[in-house]
């Protein structure tokens, strides 16, 4: 007779059986899935023993090819073979048009403004293409591990915004994966090295992949990984090295820059092969059609020097943001296949003054770290206790206040998950609604920040301006996704929004936001101070005008009223200009001139309230 398996509600009948979870590195050029096996995190191979899955999908009549077969067909069937789809995740048609010369696809628009790639199977969104890659990785993992997955940790660049992160989660869901967490790629690398080497101190994670670059500064102490600062470039990677070589071939071979898709693809494959060969060789033979030439490592390094310099500039900025000095960085971890380029390792080593760590395969380190985190989140306790992991948000989050100013609620580099609240109030008497405008960025004026969402809080009880208390709460979950709620504390009316990312963001915006915030810090501070003085002046003018309309004839002599109106006109004239100090002084002057009027109004109000009441009634 079979024995019944009895367990507490919610507990597995086999409490010591491991729950199957994986880490997935969904890369621009290559992807990989890893899992903990026999206490060690390792990549999972396919039936042929390959652990790397090229991030390539080819659409044919009635079937798909994913991986190496698709990549091999890219030259012969470029319109139906999608490579580097990660660059399109969460992007809009405007961004695709900027990349049009580099991407040999036919793009069509959709209602969501998401770009669709026209294939023989019909339009395919970047989310669908990524889902096809993730599905192959899921099937590989389940076949290797011998069971159904409870979930996966999927890595994304630290610089991925809401739209790109949400697109990644959508792709996973479409592939039949339960996302335990989205994990920043540099943080995943820190997890891998922290486990294997028990590192402590300040560590820089230099992650140069096929399409994106990330730099993270982390402090590692006793199992705690805290990201101090992040930076990078969403449009910098090994693909750009390939395009540099391809441009050189076009120039040397005397080719037209207006190439058909098949020639473009073949040219990029030739360039990629030359780049990889120059990792070990000083010179490589290059051929394209009837043209033959030689490319030296020195010439290649000269081509990519501006790209390497861009990455180093981002490194310096991240170190500055972290509050540490370059000399305090005790280790530099290299992540991504593009860090195999000798010039990259040399430049990074020179910047930080130490030889970068490369003991874990840079193509595998992210997946290995993600698998460790997935195993923990799946409920499998690790020896030595739990791993505490702290990510940060890359750009400040806030909302619009009067005068078009950006009020930061959650500053950039704040550890997530996080919830922060601030209280705001109404601007006008009797105001019954408030528009909440959610923004992202580092600048002081909303015109220089990115608009994320808008929603309206209605039903605010009628009160004088400034009496209502509206608490606005920003909440960022562990995946870096944002929700915002607003509540009027007196009445309890509330409204909220789950920020639905727009797919219309262009590639350079995030990097430009940070760059502009540094370059315009001084002028932004001046602009904010000016606008604050203008808002204060406008509010005082409105309040004084309301008081004059209500009680001016009753409580003021004609000379007193003329004096107040003269100061009001002086302030109006100054508000049309840009002299913040003068506006501030005139606002104070008008306030002083109206002090006696305000006192009379208060006395009048008190007398009216006490009229007809005796002392006993007042004391009660």
From Swiss-Prot:
Chaperone involved in the maturation of iron-sulfur cluster-containing proteins. Has a low intrinsic ATPase activity which is markedly stimulated by HscB. It comes from the Bacteria. InterPro entries: ATPase_NBD, Heat_shock_70_CS, HscA_NBD, HSP70_C_sf, HSP70_peptide-bd_sf, Hsp_70_fam, ISC_FeS_clus_asmbl_HscA. Belongs to the heat shock protein 70 family. Gene3D superfamilies: 1.20.1270.10, 3.30.420.40, Actin, Chain A, domain 4 (3.90.640.10), Substrate Binding Domain Of DNAk, Chain A, domain 1 (2.60.34.10). GO terms for biological process: iron-sulfur cluster assembly. Signal peptide: none annotated. Keywords: ATP-binding, Chaperone, Nucleotide-binding. The keyword Magnesium does not apply. One of its GO terms (molecular function) is ATP hydrolysis activity. PANTHER family: HEAT SHOCK PROTEIN 70KDA. HAMAP family: HscA. It comes from Pseudomonas putida (strain ATCC 47054 / DSM 6125 / CFBP 8728 / NCIMB 11950 / KT2440). NCBIfam families: HscA, PRK05183.1. This is Chaperone protein HscA homolog.
